[in-house]
A protein has these predicted regions:
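Secretory targeting and sorting signals
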Residues: 1-32
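Short coil/turn segments at the loop-to-beta-strand junctions that recur within blades
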Residues: 103-106, 148-151, 195-199
């Protein structure tokens, strides 16, 4: 991805080292289908990462953390704590990703990989994906799709930044993941939108 406003020199190895510091070990050979329980933590810890720039491949995709992460949205008008959630009634390509009250369920957990992928815990082998048909324009759908190690499935959440960026539609840091501000409760659409520094574009990622 073109990095015109921040350094492009963050390597996959650096990202691994940073993320591992949160939990002590990285699980290089873990199989998402073999996981049967979400490990509990005593206190949530924030997680930040820089994905490899577009066109820079990682040596071997692997998970950065042993346990899945939880992604919360800090929309100022939210009625309660809200999480990034995949529709549990779906699971196929194109399944909706939405905002929902945090409830500790598997559809609100994601495995972070060193290529920037966020794999659904509920639907192993499906990754958070920006719809190519939207072209990165305002309203581009965020969905799940077969994990395929492509830039539209590579995300970053740099330290000191509230936003989550997509590698395919980075736009010099001007396009970010956004929740529909017109829906304050469950079911708000998750999409790409021009960065506007408003709270619907503020996210926290937690290892807990």
């Amino acid at each position: 991805m073109p990095r015109t406003t921040r350094s492009a020199a963050v390597t996959a190895a650096t990202a691994v080292a940073f993320a591992v510091a949160l939990t002590g070990t990285a699980d290089a050979d873990a199989d998402a289908t073999a996981v049967t329980a979400i490990p509990a933590r005593t206190a949530p810890q924030p997680v930040y990462w820089d994905a490899p720039p577009q066109g820079v491949a990682v040596a071997a995709p692997q998970r950065l953390l042993n346990q899945p992460v939880r992604i919360t949205n800090d929309f100022a008008k939210r009625p309660t704590t809200q999480c990034l959630d995949v529709d549990a009634n779906g699971g196929g390509n194109g399944t909706v990703v939405q905002i929902w009250q945090c409830n500790g369920t598997t559809q609100q957990r994601w495995y972070l990989w060193n290529n920037g992928a966020l794999e659904s815990y509920r639907f192993p082998g499906k990754c958070l994906d920006a719809d190519l048909g939207g072209g990165g324009r305002n309203g581009t759908k965020v969905q799940i799709w077969d994990c395929n190690n492509t830039p539209q499935q590579s995300w970053s959440h740099p330290s000191g930044d509230r936003a989550i960026y997509n590698a395919r539609f980075y736009s010099g840091g001007n396009t970010v993941m956004d929740r529909d501000a017109n829906v304050v409760g469950n079911g708000a659409r998750v999409q790409l939108w021009q960065k506007n520094f408003q709270s619907q574009q503020w996210w926290d990622v937690w290892a807990d």
